[in-house]
């Protein structure tokens, strides 16, 4: 996707976490009650954070690739209510084993991958959060199965671009 002229990808930077911290609103009830002005301020804060990493124009489509953003879907939806979500998934066994075997720098999120049982629990909770948010917010989601991408890269990429309203 990053090779598309209209797409800018953000490679696993804690942008959303920084925005959430700056907004100082960490309950779903607070963010769901945002006024138009508060939402606009949150969007401006997000764009300001992005500009620390990449140059963007008004026509840029931004894809934030941090996998753990799945845990912040309520914030994402309330900051960008018409935003599109691409959920890239692998077979659960592959995703869990791969995460557990990674040598991540230890922080509060990565601590979930230090034990296999904890990694399984974290994966399950993440998927439950996604399912709940998809139903609660009627999210506009495209699910990309990693195995399908490997089998037919061009077809799966065209599907994603179509979902985003972009040409191949």
Which residue ranges define each predicted feature?
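Conserved structural-core and active-site-/substrate-pathway-adjacent residues in large, well-folded domains
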Residues: 1, 46, 123-126
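Short, well-ordered alpha-helices that flank and scaffold nucleotide-derived cofactor binding pockets
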Residues: 2-3, 78
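Post-Walker A helix-loop "phosphate-sensing" segment adjacent to the P-loop in P-loop NTPases
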Residues: 3-12
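PAPS-dependent sulfotransferase catalytic domain
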Residues: 15, 19-35, 55-168
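Core active-site phosphate/anionic-ligand binding loop and the adjoining beta-turn-alpha structural block
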Residues: 42
């Amino acid at each position: 996707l990053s090779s598309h002229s209209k797409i800018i990808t953000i490679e696993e930077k804690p942008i959303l976490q920084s925005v959430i911290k700056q907004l100082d609103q960490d309950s779903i009830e607070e963010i769901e009650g945002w006024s138009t002005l508060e939402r606009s301020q949150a969007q401006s804060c997000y764009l300001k954070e992005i500009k620390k990493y990449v140059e963007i124009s008004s026509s840029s489509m931004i894809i934030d690739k941090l996998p753990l953003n799945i845990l912040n879907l309520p914030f994402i939806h309330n900051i960008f209510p018409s935003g599109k979500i691409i959920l890239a998934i692998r077979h659960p066994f592959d995703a869990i084993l791969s995460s557990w075997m990674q040598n991540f720098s230890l922080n509060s999120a990565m601590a979930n991958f230090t034990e296999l049982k904890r990694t399984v629990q974290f994966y399950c909770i993440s998927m439950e959060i996604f399912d709940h948010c998809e139903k609660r917010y009627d999210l506009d989601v495209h699910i990309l199965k990693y195995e399908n991408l490997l089998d037919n890269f061009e077809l799966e990429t065209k599907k994603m671009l179509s979902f985003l309203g972009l040409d191949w």
